[in-house]
A protein has these predicted regions:
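Structural signal for interior beta-strand "rungs" in well-ordered beta-sheet cores
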Residues: 131-160
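Terminal amphipathic alpha-helical/low-complexity segments used for targeting or macromolecular assembly
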Residues: 1-129
Length: 160
């Protein structure tokens, strides 16, 4: 199974069911070349602030995701775990688009890579933004493998 193709097909069906969401779904999923770009676009749209624009955040996240080769596999395993274990999650695209637990975890994965590459200040920036936006506070030094589900996520704190 190619999860990216599956996600794109799901989103096309979702657009048929909810045409008013077409611009949103096109921007974040269908216009993206791959899963990494899509996740980075979603995170950038949520994490932007006065300190960093969404374009700059997307640029940072893409750079980090491409430098840490295991991140895409971890994200795929997280998405699959959500779909397989959360009865409310009917589509692979749902965690990417709508679940702040996944979005917080995806932000942590970027922060963790930054932390491991001695970019502690930027890692802490992303940790802080994830805490403010998603209610998920995961220390960038924490070790979390792929295939994790943080359901609902409000008030989750995971230390170093």
């Amino acid at each position: 199974m190619n999860i990216w193709n599956e996600i794109q097909n799901e989103v096309k069906l979702r657009i048929e069911a909810e045409p008013s969401l077409e611009p949103y779904l096109n921007q974040l999923i269908l216009s993206q070349d791959n899963l990494i770009n899509s996740v980075a676009s979603v995170l950038a749209s949520k994490l932007n602030s006065d300190a960093l624009s969404s374009d700059k955040i997307k640029e940072f996240i893409l750079d980090v995701y491409h430098k840490c080769d295991h991140i895409e596999e971890d994200l795929i395993n997280d998405i699959i775990f959500f779909k397989d274990h959360d009865p409310a999650c009917k589509y692979f695209s749902t965690p990417i688009l709508f679940y702040k637990g996944f979005q917080g975890l995806a932000t942590y994965r970027a922060a963790h890579c930054l932390w491991n590459n001695d970019r502690h200040t930027m890692a802490l920036f992303f940790q802080n933004r994830a805490s403010e936006v998603f209610g998920v506070d995961i220390h960038p030094a924490a070790e979390i493998k792929g295939g994790v589900m943080i359901d609902h996520a409000t008030g989750v704190v995971i230390g170093e």
